[in-house]
Amino acid sequence: MKLIITEDYQEMSRVAAHHLLGYMSKTRRVNLAITAGSTPKGMYEYLTTLVKGKPWYDNCYFYNFDEIPFRGKEGEGVTITNLRNLFFTPAGIKEENIQKLTIDNYREHDQKLAREGGLDLVVLGLGADGHFCGNLPNTTHFHEQTVEFPIQGEMVDIVAHGELGGDFSLVPDSYVTMGPKSIMAAKNLLIIVSGAGKAQALKNVLQGPVTEDVPASVLQLHPSLMVIADKAAAAELALG
């Protein structure tokens, strides 16, 4: 594992963008699974200025690693919609380079990735509860590949307020996510973390026991893991 601690969110975003660009600059096909949410917003802003209008990045293919469909609506779900707003549309990513995981195709997702050469890099955020992708405490098992989970109980509130602007009418019955086994199969992982609210989670993930109670703790076992965190997020780590 390699850990980079930056001064602030802006530096974290810039360093992460350049790390991602290093993979995108290869001359062969590059497969990248990337995260939505608030943490990567700055990273995508930097990255857009570096790749927009440059056809030599057309060898890069982008995958979402989870998806929440909108109840009662045809078309794309929450994650791809957010990734379009954050990066695909501003950066001018071609439609054929966007590889969508959906509630309809998730059963074939791992086989599809294997046929296409696997993932070169997965860019992950970290939840304050230690979740990654759609792998939540008390839900995920480490042996799972791409999987469908029901949305029920307290998760209905989490999805409604966290992903759907509080609109309970849009909450679906289930969502899909790449499970721990699928993520661990990627060649390289990058976790980006910002803010004091993630400090305890980052400590648990990197320096605590590997346990399904903290799903992202399994990532410390990956042979090629990079973590980029700002000082606030790294404040609880035992360094030295």
Swiss-Prot record:
Domain of life of the native organism: Bacteria
Active site: D66 (proton acceptor), D129, H131 (proton acceptor)
Stored CDD domains: GlcN6P_deaminase
InterPro entries according to UniProt: Glc/Gal-6P_isomerase, GlcN6P_deaminase-like, Glucosamine6P_isomerase, Glucosamine6P_isomerase_CS, NagB/RpiA_transferase-like
A UniProt-annotated Pfam family: Glucosamine_iso
One GO BP annotation of this record: N-acetylglucosamine catabolic process
PANTHER family listed in its UniProt record: GLUCOSAMINE-6-PHOSPHATE DEAMINASE-LIKE PROTEIN BT_0258-RELATED, GLUCOSAMINE-6-PHOSPHATE ISOMERASE
Family: Belongs to the glucosamine/galactosamine-6-phosphate isomerase family.
Record protein name field: Uncharacterized protein YieK
